[in-house]
Amino acid sequence: MSEYKHTLNLPHTEFPMRARLAEREPQRLQRWEEEDLYGAIRRARAGRERFILHDGPPYANGDIHIGHAVNKILKDIIVKARTLDGYDAPYIPGWDCHGLPIEHKVEEQAGKPGAELTYAQFRERCRAFAAEQVEGQRQDFKRLGVLGDWERPYLTMDYATEAGILRALARIFEGGHVTQGFKPVHWCADCGSALAEAEVEYEERTSPAVDVRFAVVDELALQQRVLLEGEGVQAGTASVVIWTTTPWTLPANRAVAVHPELEYVVVALDHSERLVLAAELLEATLQRAGVECYEVVGRCRGADLEGLSLQHPFLDRQVPVVLGEHVTTDGGTGCVHTAPGHGQEDFEVGQCYGLEVTNPVDGAGCFFEDTEHFAGLNVFDANPRVVEVLESRGALFHHEKYRHSYPHCWRHKTPVIFRATPQWFIDLDRHGMRECALAGIEGVRWMPDWGQARIDAMVRGRPDWCISRQRHWGVPIAVFIHRRSGEPHPQTPQHMEAVAARMEHEGLEAWWDLDPAELLGDEAAEYEKVTDILDVWFDSGVTHATVLEQREGLQVPADLYLEGSDQHRGWFQSSLLSSAAIRQAAPYRGVLTHGFTVDEQGHKMSKSRGNVVAPQDVMDRLGADILRLWVASADYSGEIAVSDNILQRTADAYRRMRNTARFLLGNLHGFEPGRDALVAEQLLPLDRWAVARTRALQERIVAAYDRYELHRIYHLLHNFCVVDMGGFYLDVLKDRLYTTPADSRARRSGQTAMYHIAEALVRWLAPILSFTADEIWGHLPGERREPVFTAEWYDGLFPLDDEPAEAAFWDRVMEVRTAVSRELERLRNEKVIGANLDAEVDLYVSSALAEELAPLGDELRFVLITSAARIHAATEAPVDAASATLEDGSEVRIAVAASAHDKCPRCWHRSPDIGASDEHPELCGRCVENVAGSGEYRATA
């Protein structure tokens, strides 16, 4: 063999078999930065139609986790694919830099503001801490292979952005959407501040559930409202019974609500007392209290009870029965304890009836010292005391423990309370803002489509947006309040603009250092500064105004917002509401959501479970491209499973794709497209089929990229590399590439097809396997001055002349080959043959199938990779021939035998004409022709 090795065209490439991604990717990243790759892409797409994916800013605190990696990789894949589409698709990363978590970190490190630090020093420490966090996260995001304007990201703490946030507030203020109010808001005692809707998460909790008697004050008034039954008037006290899981809110009770349309009953218990409750909940209520004997003595509609006076169970005041559409029969008694200071629905009902908004609880979650019975107690610690007081007053009908979903602070994981405080709100129902937001939802493409119904329901049902926080690190609500009336200064929008202009140069201190007289003149003594800051969800929610409107090369609305599915209640919603207030339209054309990462068993990631997968560890061990391929392989519309096993399987799939690329590159050694490529008409039919197959696949891949169906692309790519290429085309092609003369039509035809395939494949891979695609690009033949990321989808592919018929022919050939391969594998396992080329195959088929396969002639053996392949009539099949059924039901009988001929040392085929050449007695006839003649002729394969 050694004397003929030099006559073979063996593959050669500098593209390494071992990727060593963890080692090589950082080197490639450094080159990208040195060459300003992102800038090169921008220059290449200048003037093209834009595609804007707006980055939802991650919070600048801590290392990135696997969820961050999923989000950034998805964005990067989409931006790179849109660039291949020909769009100018800039990517400006951002960070959310204000807020409580950073305050807590700085307090731990340096002390509290107003004590160890001045407020200005504290804010400066917060700014420095956030900058450190941004830098750490930036390096990790870049390491993922995410291309963007990393040197000019947007930070909500940039002076210009802080000024922009205040200007956005001024625009909303000017539109009449900002109000003040003493309203109940979610309050975290540990934070010492109100919480946004998105900062509340629901967890299971056990609470004390109590049924409480509110005694009817006027017996005659009750009788006048009720249709009496049975014995009519009964002896004993009459009470309306409420049920609540927050006994601590009873000191703030101001009414009992009933539904106007529900049926209510008066039920007598052993002639000792009468209870009023919803008919539908009667049995359940009495059953949990262990009451078996009772009699219904009256009925009425809820509306009939309106205005009935009741005695508070332990305070010296009377409260009315009021009507509320929010009352349901899902549980409880159908009579709802109403404390306007401790619940949104209670507050709204209270507004209708002019009820006092009572809040006896301070910011630490403890009752004020003047609160009767419960002074100084924490609200949750007060629950047992409330039960004691109720029992001592004879007002407790029943008491039990109740397991239910309860709101918790997302930071502290502690239960929150509803607490009425003076706050600033964006009023959703003034000037049609809620309707505007709902209309905006209709015009957006939601992916998955269930996102539309989800956010629609949230916007319809949500309360006004509380935008104020009683903290220090954030954009100030730059408003002057009149000391007597409490009203904002009539020139507030103009004042905000003046402060914003200063903020551009001085940052937040522009407000805190401001002497009111500088803006108010002689009026300064009549006004005081607001000391609240803005909710961080406002900061990120107005980036359509502070970033998209202001940054050159961007535009509003953005084409796409892409975040986790929790952002329907977070960033998607805050962006929508603020945009509805400012622009009367949605800030995005499309919204794409992804699920959360879980382990292989579907469990959430947690340190306690030991199932956390850190992206940094994966990149250091396997490389970023493996992480990127894993993200692409997952159906991100649901939960995304990750584990070491899953990542190892991903690495195996990566190797198959890399090996396909390496085979193509190795066999394109010495191929110059401008010199050696054949035109479509000159290619062998098998090669034309391969190019056409690639073209058809490219259409599917590009369409999947456009629909953001990345997991489909992964499966298409994997199947193409493993089945179409590795399992068929390239396997068949090897013999022709290696054995025919270097410049023969047979070889150049195959190389031309491989060149077209490689040009397409590298582009398909580029959005996902960015490091590997860039590496492949550098080894492809032909001159390449621009990086792969500036390329567009390959347009050099071509269809078959008679696409349906020719495609069907090769599909049938592959079916036959698969059937033969199974039989060859069986015989290899049984040691009948050593390799496929040791075998000769006889196929016994119908005349129709024989006619279909006829174009291959003697070249059928090259397709089957056997030393001989013959076709016979089905009737001639020997009894022991194996049988296979094709997709259309036709049968193929297969007889395989070990070849009796010698093996050619050059091509390894066994052939009867070995020794026919005196000059090359070891070689088969075709190898003699390829070595000493003009080269063998191939007609089809």
Swiss-Prot record:
Cofactor: Zn(2+)
Superkingdom as given in the UniProt entry: Bacteria
SUPFAM superfamilies registered for this protein in UniProt: Anticodon-binding domain of a subclass of class I aminoacyl-tRNA synthetases (SSF47323), Nucleotidylyl transferase (SSF52374), ValRS/IleRS/LeuRS editing domain (SSF50677)
Residue positions of motif 'KMSKS' region: 604-608
Residue ranges annotated as motif 'HIGH' region: 58-68
Keyword Aminoacyl-tRNA synthetase: yes
Biological process (GO), any one: isoleucyl-tRNA aminoacylation
Pfam families to which the protein is assigned, alphabetical: Anticodon_1, tRNA-synt_1, zf-FPG_IleRS
Annotated keywords: Aminoacyl-tRNA synthetase, ATP-binding, Cytoplasm, Ligase, Metal-binding, Nucleotide-binding, Protein biosynthesis, Zinc
Cellular localization per UniProt: Cytoplasm
PROSITE patterns xrefs: AA_TRNA_LIGASE_I (PS00178)
Catalytic reactions on record: tRNA(Ile) + L-isoleucine + ATP = L-isoleucyl-tRNA(Ile) + AMP + diphosphate
Free-text domain note: IleRS has two distinct active sites: one for aminoacylation and one for editing. The misactivated valine is translocated from the active site to the editing site, which sterically excludes the correctly activated isoleucine. The single editing site contains two valyl binding pockets, one specific for each substrate (Val-AMP or Val-tRNA(Ile)).
This protein's name: Isoleucine--tRNA ligase
Lineage: Bacteria, Pseudomonadati, Pseudomonadota, Gammaproteobacteria, Chromatiales
Gene: ileS
